[in-house]
């Protein structure tokens, strides 16, 4: 049970698989699905993070199923200002309800700050999110060695580039429209000249 919800289901699996199952079960019950919201995630999904993100994958699964998808993240693994992301998410909900094009997945990233400390909102392209590599070695309960990734984001010169990563560094919230087609169209013609055979 969830407060103020007409109904709720709980699934165990990857975020995208859970969305896939949720959509299936709801459709079987005759429920019209208006949109898929994923999050609010602990930790930003900026730039190249989107390639690894379960939060973005869950929202994208909605898009693949023909349903608008929105991923929401707070740029901290220990967020303390969900209320800031909640307010923006409610505003986005109203815009998505009014309609967005097919195939669009929105990725929202919000600084872990009170609303009054956020400089504003930027509609931003994806940037390069690189990390200073750090791995923590631990021993699990079975006595096996495990490694936990603890990389720290590289800080970029915000004067040289403008994207979601640098906007977050400057304490802006960001919205980025995504699509699932990762094809490098510019290289496709060159690739066809390889004339490979199998």
PLM ranges: what are they?
Residues 1-25:
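A cross-family phosphate/adenosyl-ligand binding-site feature
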Residues 14-15, 41-44, 113, 180:
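Short glycine-rich anion-binding loops that position phosphate/pyrophosphate groups of nucleotides
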Residues 84-198:
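Electrostatically charged, flexible surface regions
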Residues 63-85:
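Glycine-rich phosphate/pyrophosphate-binding loops
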Residues 38-41, 72-73, 108-111, 176:
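Short beta-strand segments
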Residues 44-53:
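Glycine/threonine-rich flexible loop motifs
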Residues 22-29, 57-68:
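Alpha-helix C-terminal capping segments
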């Amino acid at each position: 049970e969830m407060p103020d919800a007409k109904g709720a289901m709980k699934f165990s699996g990857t975020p995208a698989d859970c969305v896939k199952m949720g959509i299936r079960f709801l459709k079987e019950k005759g429920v019209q699905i208006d949109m898929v919201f994923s999050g609010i995630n602990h930790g930003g999904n900026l730039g190249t993070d989107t390639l690894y993100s379960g939060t973005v994958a869950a929202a994208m699964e909605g898009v693949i199923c023909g349903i608008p998808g929105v991923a929401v993240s707070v740029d901290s693994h220990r967020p303390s200002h969900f209320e800031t992301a909640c307010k923006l998410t409610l505003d986005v909900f109203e815009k998505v309800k009014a309609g967005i094009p097919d195939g669009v997945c929105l990725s929202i990233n919000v600084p872990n700050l009170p609303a009054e400390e956020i400089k504003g909102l930027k509609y931003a392209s994806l940037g390069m999110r690189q990390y200073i590599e750090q791995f923590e070695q631990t021993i699990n309960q079975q006595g096996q060695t495990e490694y936990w990734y603890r990389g720290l984001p590289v800080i970029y010169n915000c004067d040289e580039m403008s994207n979601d990563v640098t906007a977050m560094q400057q304490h802006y919230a960001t919205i980025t429209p995504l699509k699932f087609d990762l094809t490098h169209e510019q290289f496709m013609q060159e690739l066809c000249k390889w004339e490979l055979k199998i």
